[in-house]
Regions:
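Catalytic, metal-anchored helix/loop core of enzyme active sites in primary metabolism
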Residues: 1-360
Length: 360
């Protein structure tokens, strides 16, 4: 029986994790829940799963993971506010099932220096796919990682045609049902850029050996290319419960968590090169990742500010990446300490607001 704490229990990842646990009461026991503002749902979850320990907010989440003994903590918090809880989990003996990619991206060395071998299991579908595929060979046999992207709702459109995109259009993701910021990030492909940085940090593969290909069907979730020319991919119908279940009990699989592909029905899988002119976010993220230090934290914070300004009607769609680029260009770098990262984030948000005000 795995004792589980779920942070972000009322969000998409948390709700689906509870679906997995509900269907497998013989394998998992919920011992703690962490939520944000949705107190009503969190308390209902606590009642259903007989959970005594419930926290609200990131600070309380840190205290929760330090005081409640668990085998695995699923961090499904959205945004860089999840960094503190991530670091708190790494102080314990629990496995960290990480869906909060931002905490790894902005924390960088802060996280890597604290994590024990095998303690961190990725929950993002792409990185879960890579982790599964990497079991087919040794690390020195890996030629490159290939992350797949659906292309978002604006695949195939030119940059000029995106100038008048509305917030409603940006939230129409073709595959996944997610929150406001991450869905917008999927439209701009900032999310894929963040995933490139995450892949580098998780798997210690250089940026020049991490590629992105557009795969509109979202069946192949990512691939590992080996030195002998073979490619190992993980494929399944889109279903976040699969990587969530692996995160909860890695490396073991949970039977029945998802439906398999139907190999008796004709289907077509396509792969396309990424249009970096229309979607420059991935290349910008790679440059930010290579720079290291506090640049990823600045990139992420500036983007969060710009996305919220876009949805508030203060700037246009193309202004999101223009704002992020301007803020990144102004940054002088900084030391990767907790204070340094938090300071860089605060600076990035202030600077982004200045850029946004000039655009408005």
């Amino acid at each position: 029986m795995r004792r589980v704490i779920i942070l972000g229990s009322t969000g998409s990842i948390g709700v689906q994790a509870l679906d997995v646990i509900r269907a497998n009461p013989d394998r998992f026991e919920v011992v703690g829940l962490g939520a944000g503002r949705n107190r009503e749902l969190a308390l209902a979850q606590a009642a259903e799963f007989a959970v005594e320990h419930v926290s609200f907010g990131a600070d309380d989440a840190e205290q929760l993971v330090r005081t409640v003994e668990a085998d695995v903590v699923l961090n499904g918090i959205t945004g860089s506010v999840g960094l503190g809880p991530t670091l708190a989990v790494l102080e314990t003996e629990a496995t960290l099932a990480l869906a909060n990619k931002e905490s790894l991206i902005v924390g960088g060395a802060l996280v890597k220096d604290r994590v024990r071998p095998g303690q961190l299991v990725p929950v993002d579908s792409e990185h879960s796919a890579i982790a599964q595929a990497l079991r087919a060979g040794s690390s020195h046999e890996v030629r490159r990682l290939v992350l797949t992207a659906s292309g978002g709702p604006f695949r195939g459109r030119s940059r000029d045609s995106l100038a008048d995109v509305t917030p409603r259009e940006a939230l129409a993701h073709p595959t996944w049902d997610m929150g406001l910021v991450i869905t917008t990030n999927s439209a701009t492909l900032v999310n894929k850029g963040l995933e490139v940085i995450e892949a580098h940090l998780l798997f210690d593969v250089p940026y020049d050996r991490i590629a992105v290909t557009v795969h509109p069907q979202s069946i192949v979730h990512s691939m590992v290319e080996f030195v002998d020319g073979s490619t190992v991919a993980q494929a399944s119908p889109p279903n976040m419960r699969l990587p969530i279940s692996l995160g909860l009990d890695w490396p073991h699989r949970v039977a029945g968590v998802g439906e398999p592909l139907d190999w008796t029905t004709a289907s077509t899988w396509t792969f396309e090169p990424l249009d970096t002119e229309a979607f420059p976010a991935v290349e910008l993220a790679k440059a930010v990742g290579v720079s290291g230090g506090t640049w990823p934290a600045v990139f992420n914070a500036a983007n969060e500010q710009a996305v919220m300004a876009f949805h508030a009607g203060r700037i246009g769609y193309l202004d999101i990446l223009d704002t992020v680029t301007e803020v990144v260009d102004r940054h002088d770098g900084g030391e990767v300490t907790l204070a340094g990262v938090l300071g860089a984030e605060a600076w990035a948000r202030r600077t982004a607001d200045e850029v946004i005000a000039a655009l408005a």
